[in-house]
């Protein structure tokens, strides 16, 4: 059964680091990183390259090649990783674009796309090679409510249709509760809470409640750690 796990918490908590560990860009100080039964840190370069070929990535804000058309952006990984003839690549690109509702935008440049359209093109590129795993780094950042809903629905539908696993890093708990099977809350590199959407909604954990409710007060402090404000104000006076 495919699933759509979610890693969610405040900026700087280690969410994107998790994606880098999965992709083999970083090695863990301790523990294991297993993808498809393989220990990622122990893979030789050729094996790591082959694993990455089976993984898709949707970067924050899409990260499309600005000097390439929509069509060329999606064709890029196919040309890079396969020896498919151009006529097959053409058909596959149009198929991926059709899946995200943008077949008619194939010849547009990234500068001609709205934020939501750009994210959908990036999603089509992420599934270009029919991966077993797709990683999403803040896929909802900067999107209007309609585009956000469309992208969230696409992630869920493609996850189910392709039978893949999706790892979604996001701050948007509300949207993610509608699309994932399991949520993981990360703080300072540690999973502090987890559960299904139903379990998260019913949770009384103060940390989970603060994040789900968007409350300003709770375990996640408003102030960054600092010396006493009084001591800082009168440090020179006392000296």
Residue ranges, per PLM feature:
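Conserved ABC ATPase "signature" region
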Residues: 38-39, 86-105
